[in-house]
Amino acid sequence: MLELAYLQTLPQQRALLKADYADFIVKEDLGYAMTGEGEFVALYVRKTDANTLFVGEQLAKFVGLSPRNMGYAGLKDRKAVTEQWFCLQMPGKAMPDFSRFNMAGVEILQVTRHSRKIRTGSLNGNHFEILLRNAVETDELKVRLENIKNFGFPNYFTEQRFGKDGHNLTQAMRWANGEIKVKDRKKRSFYLSAARSEVFNLVVSERIRQGLANQVLAHDILQLAGTHSWFTADGKEDLALLQTRLENHDLQLTAPLIGETQQLACELENKLVERHQSLISLMKRERMKPARRPLLMQARDFHWEFVENGLKLKFYLPAGSYATALVRELVNIDENE
């Protein structure tokens, strides 16, 4: 992440992230309520230092199911305290006694029924509560906080997307260059996601470097705020009007998530993407579905408080955006190993 541009400038302070699991709290927002009836048993679970997939597998095992009959909306940080829903497909079966389920770091907060499987990606977003230890109240940091509240932060994919020490991206590059073959479906998915995230990040970073993170250009692809609807600034609408709508947060600039048939935007974007032909060829060859992603992101309900041992943050992000991308604009991160 160090080579990527900052929307503001390089932060002056260092702070410790995840010194304790409770310093990083995530609460899932599915955007819908459980129905209270149906063939799926739904469990709302609090996890501390626990892997999402492993917890789900253990819940399935506890009731005698295959992991295929278990569902969840998204993977959560392991080094954190996280709350999320799991579901188990159990048509016609009595509700199990989960009071006998015993797993270190796992607490079942609620058990109910639901009519549909909770599928990966079926969530609105996440609520975050983060403590940045050793952060000190200064004018510089207060300005950064206000800027994030008012203007947002680069919507980068962060280290989690690329694997430990960037392993997934390294393997994607080797695959793209013909150095390895990848047959395992799970690895293919991880490597392709890392490749696409890298190209997105580099496009966003270069646009920031050129001072164009908040500037509508001809042929930009814009997203209506709060939706997944896009349109192209192709001259039918006045660029000045689109710029006003962007500044009023009615629109968002987007950058590409490269796929098989990609609609690229402005001339700048085309030039940037051309630099990464090997990765792009790989993604097209593997027939990835193209998409767009907001270039900048604004946290909802963004609040902060300086406390004795650091800076407390509370905010909400839509699914797919990373809290560590926001934190990166505030402080240089020292992560507790």
UniProtKB/Swiss-Prot annotation:
Reaction(s) catalysed by this chain's protein: uridine(13) in tRNA = pseudouridine(13) in tRNA
Active site: residue positions: D77 (nucleophile)
Enzyme kind, highest EC tier: isomerase
PROSITE patterns: TRUD, UPF0024
UniProt KW Phosphoprotein keyword: no
Key words, A-Z: Isomerase, tRNA processing
UniProt GO molecular function: RNA binding; tRNA pseudouridine(13) synthase activity
Residue intervals of the TRUD domain: 152-308
Top-level division of the source organism's lineage: Bacteria
EC number(s) recorded for this UniProt protein: 5.4.99.27
Gene Ontology cellular-component terms listed: cytosol
Keyword Metal-binding on entry: no
GO biological processes: tRNA pseudouridine synthesis
Family: Belongs to the pseudouridine synthase TruD family.
PANTHER family on file: TRNA PSEUDOURIDINE SYNTHASE D
Role: Responsible for synthesis of pseudouridine from uracil-13 in transfer RNAs.
UniProt protein name: tRNA pseudouridine synthase D
Gene: truD
